[in-house]
Regions:
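Bateman (tandem CBS) regulatory domains
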Residues: 1-11, 65-75
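A glycine-centered beta-loop-beta connector
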Residues: 27, 35-51, 91, 99-115
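Cytosolic regulatory modules rich in charged/polar residues
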Residues: 83, 104-130
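The conserved cystathionine-beta-synthase
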Residues: 13-31, 38, 78-95, 102, ...
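Conserved protein kinase catalytic domain
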Residues: 7, 24, 45, 54, ...
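Nucleotide phosphate-binding site architecture
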Residues: 4, 12, 21, 54-55, ...
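A short, polar/charged loop-to-alpha-helix boundary motif
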Residues: 54-67, 118-130
Length: 130
C-alpha cells in the first residue's frame, strides 16, 4: 500500500509569519495535532504540533511572536509514492507522530499521523469530540 492511499489530504497549513496564538487556536478549534508551515510554493518549511504549543506556553513565549521562532524546522517528510512500511519505519526511527507527505517536486500534498497508522494496522477509528 502506498502512502498516498492512507494520507489525509485536507491538511491545515499556515505561513511562518502567523502568530503562535493563531496557531494554537487553529489546533484547538479544528481538533488537530499539527499545522504544517508552508512557503508560497506549498513546500513544507516547518511543523507546529500540540507538543510545541505546550512547550511554548510552559516557557512563557509571547503568543504574538511568529511561528518561525518556535516551529520545528528541517521536517522529516516522505514521498507520496513511498510504501506504508517505509512511512512506518520513518516514523519509528525519528520518533515523530506527524509525517508530511510531498510530491516529486517537494510540494506538500498530505499528512500521515500516528492515528492513521493505528487505524490502518488495527482498524482503530478516532472520533472527534462534539
Amino acid at each position: 500500500m502506498k502512502v498516498r492511499h492512507i494520507m489525509v489530504e485536507n491538511v491545515v497549513t499556515a505561513k511562518e509569519d502567523n502568530t503562535i496564538k493563531n496557531a494554537i487556536e487553529m489546533l484547538y478549534k479544528k481538533h488537530i495535532g499539527s499545522i504544517i508551515i508552508t512557503d508560497d510554493e506549498g513546500k513544507c518549511k516547518g511543523i507546529f504540533t500540540e507538543r510545541d504549543a505546550i512547550r511554548v506556553v510552559a516557557q512563557k513565549v509571547a503568543l504574538d511572536e511568529p511561528l518561525r521562532k518556535v516551529m520545528t524546522k528541517n521536517v522529516i517528510t516522505i514521498q507520496e509514492d513511498a510504501t506504508f512500511e517505509e512511512a512506518r519505519r520513518r516514523i519509528i526511527s525519528h520518533g515523530i507522530r506527524h509525517l508530511p507527505v510531498v510530491n516529486q517536486k517537494g510540494k506538500m500534498v498530505g499528512l500521515l499521523a500516528i492515528r492513521d497508522f493505528l487505524d490502518e494496522l488495527f482498524g482503530i477509528k478516532f472520533l472527534k469530540p462534539d
